[in-house]
Amino acid sequence: MRKLNYYIYTLCFLSLFIGCGEKQLNKPVAINSNPPGLVSNVKVVNENGKAVITYSLPSDEDLSYIKADYETSPGISTEVLASRHTNTLTVDGFGDTLSHIVKLFSVNSSGVESSAVEVTVNPKTPGYILAARSLKIEPTFGGFTLNCKNPTGDDLAVIPMVDTSGNGNWVQTIGMDNVYSNDTVIAAAIHNQPSVRRKFAFTVRDKWQHYSDTLIVGLTPVFEQKLDKSTWATITLPNDAQILNNGGWCYEYYMWDGNEHPGWPQTYFTVESATTPQTATIDLGSAHTFSRFKINPYLEVGNFYYVRGNPKDFEIWGSNSPDLSDPEPDILSDPTWTKLGTFHVVKPSGSPSQTETSADQASAYNGWEFDFPTGLSAYRYIRIRQLSNWQGTYFICISELTLWGD
């Protein structure tokens, strides 16, 4: 019993000792209530929507950081911190070109601030205003295209709206989503709009919730419809890809049977041994002017889309009088075929093979959609030419192909 009590007392003593030690360690080594010195030799370089400030640091040994306090807009305060290991900080988020006062504070390791050093910045025109000034809207099939320059590379949203009732009530209809981008040139197409003249409104917003003036335009989208697949037919040219037979034939017509998410083997699939770009040819029954198209990839084993023969880089060609007599036609030199475009599938996450995020899966499930270049002639026959699949080879796998146009 005495030994047990001895052990208990010893453990209690050690616990108290350790607890006291922890309290001591959590206490500041020293409290410095003296404010540090001021920054000096302050210089400003004004840029679009922001300013870069350089300065000389005070000589205080316990200087922790420099703080800048300022308002991006009246009543909207923000602060920026810069380590003691740099003499530069950037104040950004300005929504105008007015003069703004920035207060610079030196802060020591105890959190004590110096008095403020005031400097005036005069930011240049913010990126969202530059983008709005360059915004151009043009009617296209089933909607409109929008293009603008974003020379500052800011994170911007172009917000489209439409007055469906003609009474100034601006709304976003189905398919009319915001366009988000930080590219130096922002380009997008909005579809699913009726071919009637209406007023559309556009504004540009940045990540600080600054909004540009609204651009209002009246336009009539070009008539567009989903092409009727019941007239489509297989036409096999001599050097077209050979379809696969593995538990059943993977016929070409599965590309237009209306099933975007088929099981095996109800998908178009070609032999995997191909060593050159492969082609598939379709007779649409009549000539059409194409506006856009969608490819639904096949969901492979393991629940993956961005694998194996699903298209990654490919071309689409058009013709009205293909030469069927040539035993080995070369689409690149055959004058009866015209290249309509080269297309690249982007994996939203950019993750490696067999790693697919929910965004990757949603993009593939909904179908990879592309716009054709404007000004194309009408064509009856099309060829899909696979340049590279997700395996880095040439065989083709497509669950469904859908075309829009007139």
What are these regions (language model features)?
Residues L16-G19:
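C-terminal motif of bacterial Sec signal peptides marking the signal peptidase cleavage site
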Residues L89-V117, D183-P221:
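Beta-strand-rich modules
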Residues T164-I190, F202-L244:
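Preference for solvent-exposed, low-hydrophobicity sequence contexts
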Residues E260-I331, A364-D406:
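Aromatic, loop-rich ligand-recognition surfaces of beta-strand-rich domains
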Residues V217-G285, Y298, D360:
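Disordered, acidic Ser/Thr/Pro-rich linker "stalks" and the adjacent N-terminal cap
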Residues G21-E61, E113-D154, D213-T236, W404:
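Pro/Thr/Ser/Gly-rich low-complexity, intrinsically disordered linker/stalk tracts
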Residues V42-G127:
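Post-signal peptide N-terminal segment of secreted/secretory-pathway proteins
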